[in-house]
C-alpha cells in the first residue's frame, strides 16, 4: 500500500506486516455529526484494506472525555462529567455500528491516562521545554527546532488559528496542564491536562514506539497534530508517526461542518431518513483527502448505487453476509476483489474502485441474463459480493430486508395482513379487491412483486 503523507506531501509505501494506527476520536459532549462520521468511515476503509492485504493491524481511536466544552455542558446541566461523557460515548458507538465501522482494538479515554500525561509533562519540564503562567504549564515552541515541520507552513499562516488569552512567550505556545482546583493533584498544582497532551500520552502508553499511521481530520493538522508531534519529539525523543493522514471537511453551503459554527448535521438526523450503509457509501464516495459539500441529492444518488448491489443480491437470493471474520484472516479469491484491492492500495483511490464495482454489477447482471441457471456463475458472483462487502464495509444486509428498510413493526404487520387479503381475493377471482389493495399499498409507497413463491413487497424510494 502507498499513502500520501501530509507531512512530506509524498506517497510512502507501507511494506510492514504489523501496522499501528491511531485515529483522533471525538470530544464527547454532544452527538456526532457527519464530519465525525466521514473521518471514521474513511479510516475504517483503510483498516479493512490493510486487513484484506493480510496485515496485522493495531487500531486505536480515542475519546476526549475532559475538555472545556464538556465542562461547559456540565455547568449548564445537573449531570456529572462522567454521566455526560458516558452517554455520548455510547451514542457515538451506536452510530459507528450503524455505519459498519469496525470496533477499534483500543478505545482510550483521556481521563484514564492522567498519570501518563503528568509523566510526559515532567520529562518536558526536566529538559527545559516548559514554563509556568498563572493559569497553567505551557510548552515553549521556540525550544523545538522542528516545530511546524508537520504542517509545513510558516507561523504567520498558522497564527490566525490560535487564541492568545494569556501573555505567552510565543503566540504558538500551548498549555500542557491547566490549573483547576476541581480536578487532579500533581506536583505542578491541581489541574487537568491540555488537549494536545492527551493524545501523545495515550499513544505512548498503548503503542510505545513510533506509529505507522496517525490519522484525523484536516482541521487537526494545526495546531493539534503539530503540537502532538512536538511533545513526542521533545518528551519521548522520537517521531510520533511515520505517516500522517488527514481527511477533508464535510461542508454545508461551502462552509466546514462544525458544532462551533452551528451548522452541524448529526449522524442520527441522517439515519432517520437513510440506512447506515447508504450514508457510509455516500461518505466514502469521494477521496478521503477531498472536501465535499453535503447534498441530499448526492446522498440519494449514493443510495441508488447501493440499490444496484442489493438488486443483484436479491436476484441471487443471497442473504445476510457476516462481517465477523473481517478482523481475522480474510482470503481474497475473486478476480474483481483483487482488482479493487489493488486500486485501493494506491492511497485509497475510492472513485476508481467504485467505478469498477459499478461495472462488475452491470456485467454480472448481463451474464445472469445469458445464463440464469448457471450455478457456478451464481456462486462465483456470490463469493465476490461477500469479499467486496468486507472490503468496502457495505452490502452485508439481507436483500429483502434492505428493500423493506424504514418500515415499523406495526406497518409491517398491516402490510402482511393486506397481502394475505389480496392473495385470498385473487384465489376467489375478486380482482377488483386485489387491485384496490395494491393501490392502497402503493399510496403508502409499498410496491408488490408477485413471484412463483408468493408475493413479496418493497418500500419505494421517496
Swiss-Prot record:
Its main location: cytoplasm. Its EC number is 6.1.1.16. InterPro entries: Cys-tRNA-ligase, Cys-tRNA-synt_Ia_DALR, Cys-tRNA/MSH_ligase, Rossmann-like_a/b/a_fold, tRNA-synt_1_cat_dom, tRNAsynth_Ia_anticodon-bd. It comes from the Bacteria. ATP binds at residue 259. A motif ('KMSKS' region) lies at residues 256-260. One of its GO terms (biological process) is cysteinyl-tRNA aminoacylation. It is found in: Cytoplasm. A motif ('HIGH' region) lies at residues 26-36. It catalyses: tRNA(Cys) + L-cysteine + ATP = L-cysteinyl-tRNA(Cys) + AMP + diphosphate. GO terms for molecular function: ATP binding; cysteine-tRNA ligase activity; zinc ion binding. Keywords: Aminoacyl-tRNA synthetase, ATP-binding, Cytoplasm, Ligase, Metal-binding, Nucleotide-binding, Protein biosynthesis, Zinc. GO terms for cellular component: cytosol. Monomer. This is Cysteine--tRNA ligase. The gene is cysS.
